[in-house]
Amino acid sequence: DYGVLEDAVHRLMTDLTRKLHELRPDVLIEFRQNYIGPVMRQYGNMFRVGDCPYSTSYNRVGIVDLRLTSGRTAVHSDMLMWNPEDRVENAACQIENVLFANVQLSARLDRIPEEHLRMMRFWTRLMQDEQHLLQEAPLYAEQPQMLYPVVRTEEKGRSVIACYQHGVLAEVPASRLDDVYLINANSGSTMLARFDQKARWKATVWNCLGEIQTEEEWEPEGLVEWKIPECGMVRLQKVR
């Protein structure tokens, strides 16, 4: 018997976790917000955002909060669903808001239009190709009082910067980056970025379907604004 509830709960969870791992060493144990915190990492190996149907901002904030407090524990989004008749840009916005976590797609693939499927293939392929940069590289999030309008990861000269509100500024430290994804994850058609030094880049712009819009060399300096499709993306690769 235990005289303190917290000690009893700890013993219960420890015993359960140990027994489950004995039965299956690769068992997956998931906890969902708000029953989580750094101490819960010793009991589970997946943390998931709480229920937030069709709430892109709640999903994003939940993911960032988990990423910043969960170490290397896997972080999962809440499931994604949308109206098949919705604009493809709105559907893309849902996926873009969970780029920095393991996405849980629950949209019925047999009920959504081909345009939505093309969009999903593009973004899920990016998440697979850049899994380490998106989910394991150090994550930085700005202005929690504004629900993290800019979120980025950066490691070894590469970065992903996602802007979730139109008009927010993306800081691009060109002095230390060679490869940058800038994601316009909002309803605007322009992006603002500030480069800390002049450099020459190959700039490839995609719309949310993964269709290339422009591909050119570019030499931005200081504060710049340029056209990026709604929920589209530009990749900047430094030219040597």
Briefly describe each language-model feature range.
Residues D1-V9, W82:
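The substrate-binding groove and active-site-proximal loops of carbohydrate-active enzymes
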Residues L12-I228:
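Active-site-proximal substrate-binding groove within the catalytic cores of carbohydrate-active enzymes
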Residues R235-K238:
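Intrinsic low-complexity, polar/charged intrinsically disordered segments
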Residues P229-M233:
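Tight coil/turn sites that cap or link beta-strands
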